[in-house]
């Protein structure tokens, strides 16, 4: 009885310590991501999930980081493993809260990344699924700049399906999701108005401007982007791609 009472009285302290641990680990995970050291950040957020498997913030972070880290890999199996993990983390978060804006956004990101190298048929199937998640994300948080970026990419990719892909999709499904370059530009611009430090979004917006024959806007966007400090491990490579695009435009 005495042992039981000691245990019961100690429970609030144990929960308090656990909560403090999670707050500290979250701060450290965010710090590592901002360094940026994305592998270390990923491991830190996984530590949180060991303590609290239903921590939605950490599930979302693990999903997003897996999508980013996976994209930089060179081995196809490793790439696929990261993308599967990204979808798994997002899926767990969505089971906890189906309307969580960030969870829907990171699921859309994971699906988008994993469909980049797929065939036309698979790309169309993924496109339908991505649109569901990105629409739900924006509906629940209209200020989610990453979701607007994904919507821009969705429109850009669908608007650029070649004739064979579009014809095959129509034969298979009767219709295909409608995407357009102009809608892509609107979504990318919206993302920039919410967060003006998202380097990938600047690059994709510049590409869209260039494809839409708005050369001056593309050049201005790239030059502005090159002045923004790097925030992710992908940013240096994105800037190099942007410099090459700038030379091509000029």
Model region roles, listed by residue range:
Residues 20-25, 165-166, 197-199:
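Generic helix N-cap/helix-start motif at coil->alpha-helix transitions
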Residues 1-25:
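Bacterial Sec-dependent N-terminal signal peptides
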Residues 199-237:
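C-terminal/domain-terminus segments
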Residues 16-71:
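N-terminal leader/linker segments that initiate helical-solenoid repeat arrays
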Residues 32-40, 65-99, 106-143, 153-191, ...:
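Short coil/linker segments at helix-helix boundaries
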């Amino acid at each position: 009885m005495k042992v039981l009472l000691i245990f019961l009285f100690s429970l609030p302290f144990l929960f308090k310590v656990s909560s403090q641990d999670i707050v500290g680990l979250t701060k450290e995970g965010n710090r590592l991501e901002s360094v940026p050291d994305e592998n270390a950040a990923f491991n830190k957020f996984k530590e949180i999930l060991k303590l609290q498997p239903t921590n939605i913030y950490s599930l979302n972070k693990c999903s997003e980081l897996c999508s980013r880290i996976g994209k930089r890999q060179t081995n196809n199996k490793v790439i696929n493993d990261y993308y599967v993990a990204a979808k798994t983390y997002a899926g767990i978060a969505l089971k906890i809260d189906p309307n969580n804006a960030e969870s829907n956004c990171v699921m859309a990101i994971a699906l988008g990344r994993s469909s980049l190298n797929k065939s036309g048929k698979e790309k169309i199937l993924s496109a339908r699924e991505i649109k569901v998640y990105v629409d739900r994300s924006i509906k629940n948080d209209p200020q989610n700049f990453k979701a607007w970026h994904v919507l821009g990419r969705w429109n850009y990719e669908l608007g650029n399906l070649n004739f064979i892909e579009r014809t095959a999709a129509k034969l298979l499904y009767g219709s295909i999701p409608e995407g357009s370059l102009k809608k892509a530009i609107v979504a990318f611009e919206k993302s920039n108005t919410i967060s003006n430090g998202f380097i990938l979004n600047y690059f994709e917006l510049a590409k869209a401007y260039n494809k839409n024959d708005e050369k001056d806007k593309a050049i201005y966007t790239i030059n502005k982007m090159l002045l923004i400090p790097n925030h992710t491990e992908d940013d240096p490579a994105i800037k190099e791609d942007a410099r090459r695009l700038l030379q091509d435009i000029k």
